[in-house]
A protein has these predicted regions:
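Generic structural signal for individual residues within well-ordered alpha-helical segments
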Residues: 127, 181, 228, 236, ...
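Histidine-acidic residue clusters that define the catalytic metal-binding segment
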Residues: 43-66, 208-248, 278-284, 409, ...
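Short, polar/flexible loop-turn hinges at active-site or ligand-entry regions and domain interfaces
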Residues: 117-120, 170-178
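Juxtamembrane low-complexity tails/linkers enriched in Ser/Thr-Pro and polybasic
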Residues: 1-3
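M16 family metallopeptidases and their MPP-like homologs
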Residues: 79, 84-111, 123-170, 184, ...
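N-terminal glycine-/lysine-enriched basic segments
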Residues: 191
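His/Glu-rich zincin catalytic helix
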Residues: 5-136, 149-154, 160, 164, ...
């Protein structure tokens, strides 16, 4: 499923996608390997009734977030928004690939199978059922979490049957064998495609090197060896425990009263399997710094530099978000983009980002560059990082980043879809209901020294795990920095 792009500064809550978890606010971004193909295959079509409303998003406003727990143990966050006659609901389960155990790919397969069948309805009938009501269903699974979402008109004659079907899909899927085989084949085709994608190969290798035996090490999609071995019995067992009412956060936004919202939450949570929240995963061990190369025939080399970052509870979150925005999270004008692309023309783009998760997510820098200049470019990136850690941001850089945040921040609550993503993140990571205001206040009060101290506390050039993927070729010296670099970046990245 796809989501709107939102300001990079809220990384983690509104995150980037570098490692495989991301189309959801917060996870940074980590769009999983074969999951894009699955998402495309399973994306639902919008009826005109909702499509027309999508262009009429209400303006940003202060949120009055209400929260409670259902009798079954589901945590609910709700915001009334009566500007449009519709509502958005998102269920966030602690049912991502970090819960796969010895069956990598189990979480994403379970999630992908939710809307493939319920009693009396196959995948086509389910899709038609939502369409006939003007409703949208969406799903996805990532490192920490699995999602199921519903967008519906709020009128009772549309809302109630849409909720009934949604509750069946999420709570009582039948997991038909023919769909299971088809989705497995789609995933296996995705694994074959990965072999021709040096960027993906580098990403997979990086996560293994960075996380070792930790659950974050394996791709959310599993692999060509693990997926064929997964059985329907494993899906049913995983669904029974990971999709339990005690393991879900329900985010609701829209044209509903508190009474209606409570009834919806009760209906959905009572349809789920009974059970408690799953235990949180352990923190990863610090890996050894290393440099690793994957030989791949191409004109460019993919470079990934990473180390363990922070979890979502870290008190330095705001300072690191601001610091990364200046380093490489904000596109043109950042330290990395200025030195690597704008002055030397060595890359199409270079980006950095933290991906805070339940356990420590990665900090990562990624780029593609000309193969014959890959070694020099790698050293340049390391030098830029080292210099930034040594000097910190300038006052002007910090002031500019604060202004950018102040200007873009209202977009984070501009529509119901934006708000439901924020609520889901707040509930899943146990953030205070005042989180958005707190984050903005903390960010705007930061000093240069606070940003510098936070970046140095959590980052070190001596801890980098580096993976490159490309050909081994004779190296050329880098061009001197210039306002008009002689070496222009290739127009389009290879992968």
């Amino acid at each position: 499923m796809s989501e709107r792009k939102t300001p990079r500064l809220l990384l983690g809550l509104i995150a980037i996608a570098v490692i495989g978890s991301a189309a959801f606010y917060l996870m940074p971004g980590v769009k999983t390997d074969a999951s894009e193909a699955l998402d495309n295959a399973k994306s639902s079509q919008k009826l005109q009734s909702l499509a027309e409303l999508d262009g009429k998003a209400p303006a940003s406003r202060k949120l009055d977030v209400q929260s409670w727990n259902t009798a079954e143990g589901a945590k609910v966050l709700f915001v009334e928004a009566h500007e449009l006659p519709m509502f958005d609901m998102r269920l966030i389960f602690a049912a991502g690939s970090s819960q796969d155990g010895n069956a990598p790919g189990l979480a994403i397969l379970t999630n992908a199978m939710l809307n493939e069948g319920v009693a009396g309805k196959d995948v086509g009938a389910i899709a038609q059922g939502f369409e006939s009501l003007g409703a949208d269903f969406g799903n996805g699974a990532y490192k920490d979490m699995a999602l199921a979402s519903l967008r519906s008109l709020s009128a009772a004659d549309k809302r109630e049957p849409a909720l009934k079907l949604f509750s069946e899909v999420v709570g009582k899927p039948t997991f038909p064998a023919d769909s299971f085989a088809r989705i497995k084949n789609q995933m296996l085709a995705g694994f074959e495609y990965q072999k021709q994608n040096p960027g993906k190969l580098a990403s997979l290798e990086l996560m293994k090197r960075l996380y070792g035996d930790h659950p974050y090490a394996h791709s959310s999609d599993g692999n060509a060896q693990s997926v064929p071995k997964i059985t329907l019995a494993q899906l049913r067992e995983f669904h029974a425990k990971a999709y339990a009412a005690g393991n879900v956060v329900i985010a609701l936004v829209g044209d509903l009263s508190r009474t209606e919202a409570e009834a919806i939450a009760n209906q959905v949570s009572s349809a789920l399997p009974k059970g408690p929240a799953l235990a949180k995963i352990a923190q990863p061990q610090e890996p050894k710094a290393s440099i690793n190369h994957i030989e791949f025939p191409s004109k460019q080399t993919n470079l990934l530099l990473a180390q363990l970052g922070i979890d979502r509870d870290d008190p330095d979150y705001a300072a690191l978000s601001m610091g990364n925005q200046i380093l490489g999270g904000g596109g043109f004008g950042t330290r990395l983009m200025s030195e690597v692309r704008e002055k030397r023309g060595l890359t199409y783009g270079v980006y950095s980002g933290f991906s805070p998760m339940q356990a420590r997510g990665p900090f990562m820098i990624n780029l593609q560059t000309r193969a014959e200049m890959s070694e020099g470019t790698l050293k340049l990136v390391q030098d830029v990082l080292a210099d930034y850690l040594k000097t910190g941001p300038t006052q002007k850089e910090l002031d500019d980043a604060k202004r950018e945040l102040a200007g873009s921040f209202p977009l984070s609550t501009a529509s119901n879809a934006d708000i439901v993503g924020q609520l889901g993140a707040m509930g899943f990571y146990n953030l205070p209901l005042s989180y958005l205001d707190d984050f903005m206040r903390q960010s705007q009060s930061l000093t240069v020294e606070q940003v510098k101290d936070a970046m140095n506390k959590h980052l070190s050039t001596d801890k980098l795990v580096i993976v490159s993927a490309g050909p081994t070729v004779p190296q050329k010296p880098l061009p001197a920095p210039s306002d008009k670099p002689a070496e222009q970046p290739l127009g389009v990245p290879e992968h």
